[in-house]
Amino acid sequence: MIETTRPELVAYQEERLAKFVNENQKLDKGQIVFAGDSITEFFALKKYLGRDFPLVNRGIAGTDSVWLLEHLKEQVLDLEPSKLVLLIGINDIGRGYPIRDIVNRISDIIMTVRQESLLTEVYLLSVFPVSEKSQYAAKVKIRNNASVGELNQQLAVLPGVTYVDLYDYLTDAQGQLNDTYTTDGLHLSPQGYQVLAEPIKKEILE
């Protein structure tokens, strides 16, 4: 089943974006910005990554590369980040977009940041695995690891960005998103975020 965006989710997204616009006037420039969808939004950055880093969470649930490209200024660029950590694409797969189109939009996001915010280092996280087990089908819908793997293979060679591959940290012996690390086959549990903390600190923050 292809995922559609419900009106109440759109209202939430617009409300969260408006909150960002208001915050942009007050926040210091040059912080480390994490941008993406719900997996980023639900990432309690200071809890898992510590308070030694100037971290800003700019995740918005239910968004995809179409949304992020359209709202990049308000969500990211106005903060003039020292580093940008991107995690986007799983909802594009959920909406049935061709892999080639997803890659092109993410490439456009990266190039726009590099042109508009010259001092920003851009890091692109691999799209995370899902669990294709039957109990998670209602949430995961048409998302699948074959598509995620195809997308990641192309994201890994994009120019102008540091690609950070976290995929295997989250998989079980069958290559699925580990039950311990997920709440619903798609989103991460506290244990899932915890297992990513050290590689993110090592590869990006330190």
PLM regions and their residue ranges:
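N-terminal secretory targeting modules
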Residues: 1-35, 40-51, 205-206
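Catalytic His-Asp segment of secreted/periplasmic serine-dependent ester chemistry enzymes
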Residues: 2, 129-206
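Acidic/histidine-rich helix-loop elements
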Residues: 4-7, 52-65, 185
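Structural beta-sheet core signal
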Residues: 34, 86, 123-126
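Oxyanion-hole/transition-state-stabilizing segment in secreted/luminal serine hydrolases
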Residues: 41-54, 66-104, 129-131
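A short acidic, glycine-rich active-site loop
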Residues: 57-66, 141-149
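A short helix->loop->beta-strand "cap" motif at the edges of active sites that frequently abuts
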Residues: 117-121
